[in-house]
């Protein structure tokens, strides 16, 4: 009979609910999501303070931008999940307000289901509108976002881990990796949430930091983020269980992998456009500052 370590049984010691306020449960995922936003904002503030020649953005503009894109993330993430993953998408489309209704039969159950790729689409759309309205450089704001998001993303995936969701695939009985497995319903599964936190968050951030000094053209960091994230997500999906309502598609690919390939192709084509852009010059920076 197989014995399990404390790590294998870690879910026995982690309650998805951090605490309750009256009858409302506050989940770890919610706490981690807020932490992710704050970390990303703090990193962005650090870059516009210490690398202002690369990111000529004021604190006031950054705060305003953050509010705009956060609305885009919430709307895009939820709508994206409903359209791509939810088996009840047609019911939601008939009553779209139900996408954001945290109550079921008068009981608070929260809002379940959030798509990263949908959130990214909402983020970009909100950024485009913001930069158009405020007459700002879309590429500079997106470069700043690209290098600020990854470490915040780490907290989001840890939140998934604490919330007992987005489980990894079952580890084969003869695999030497069973020691790192997490026991879920009697089966050892890969801690794919932590794999994603490391690969899509920490590794991507390190790569972008290494690229920063060479990224002279606006949009370079955005393109690099798209490529790095898409590749990391594609690989990590091999350790992550596909959504039960979706399953696997052509060549055994998950929906996450298909969307990552789409993201990779878009990033490459975007890179061709960025390649012909002029480097950020001191004259352009001065012009940006005068407009503020």
UniProtKB/Swiss-Prot annotation:
GO terms for biological process: lipoprotein biosynthetic process. It is found in: Cell inner membrane. Disulfide bonds: none annotated. It is a multi-pass membrane protein. The chain crosses the membrane at residues 24-44, 65-85, 110-130, 136-156, 192-212, 219-239, 256-276. One of its GO terms (molecular function) is phosphatidylglycerol-prolipoprotein diacylglyceryl transferase activity. It is an enzyme of class 2 (transferase). Its EC number is 2.5.1.145. Keywords: Cell inner membrane, Cell membrane, Membrane, Transferase, Transmembrane, Transmembrane helix. This is Phosphatidylglycerol--prolipoprotein diacylglyceryl transferase. It comes from Helicobacter hepaticus (strain ATCC 51449 / 3B1).
């Amino acid at each position: 009979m197989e014995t399990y370590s404390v790590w294998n049984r870690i879910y026995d010691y982690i309650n998805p609910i951090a605490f309750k306020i009256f009858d409302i449960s506050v989940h770890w995922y919610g706490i981690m999501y807020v932490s992710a936003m704050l970390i990303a904002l703090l990193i962005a503030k650090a870059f516009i303070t210490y690398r202002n020649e690369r990111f000529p953005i004021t604190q006031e503009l950054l705060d305003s931008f953050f509010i705009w894109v956060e609305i885009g993330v919430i709307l895009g993430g939820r709508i994206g999940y409903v359209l791509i993953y939810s088996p009840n998408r047609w019911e939601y489309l008939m009553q779209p307000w139900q996408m954001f209704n945290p109550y079921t039969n008068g009981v608070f159950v929260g809002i379940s289901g959030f798509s990263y790729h949908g959130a990214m689409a909402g983020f970009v759309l909100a950024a485009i509108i913001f930069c158009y309205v405020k007459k700002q450089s879309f590429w500079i704001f997106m470069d700043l976002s690209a290098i600020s998001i990854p470490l915040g993303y780490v907290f989001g995936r840890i939140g998934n881990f604490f919330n007992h969701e987005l489980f990894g695939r079952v580890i084969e009985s003869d695999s030497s990796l069973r020691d790192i497995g997490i026991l879920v319903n009697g089966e050892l599964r890969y801690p794919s949430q932590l794999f994603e936190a490391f690969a899509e968050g920490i590794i991507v951030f390190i790569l972008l930091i290494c690229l920063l000094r060479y990224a002279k053209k606006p949009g370079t960091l955005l393109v690099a983020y798209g490529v790095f994230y898409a590749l990391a997500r594609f690989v990590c999906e091999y350790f992550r269980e596909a959504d039960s309502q979706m399953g696997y598609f052509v060549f055994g690919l998950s929906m996450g992998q298909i969307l990552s390939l789409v993201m990779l192709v878009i990033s490459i084509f975007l890179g061709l456009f960025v390649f012909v852009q002029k480097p950020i010059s001191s004259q352009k920076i001065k012009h940006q500052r005068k407009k503020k």
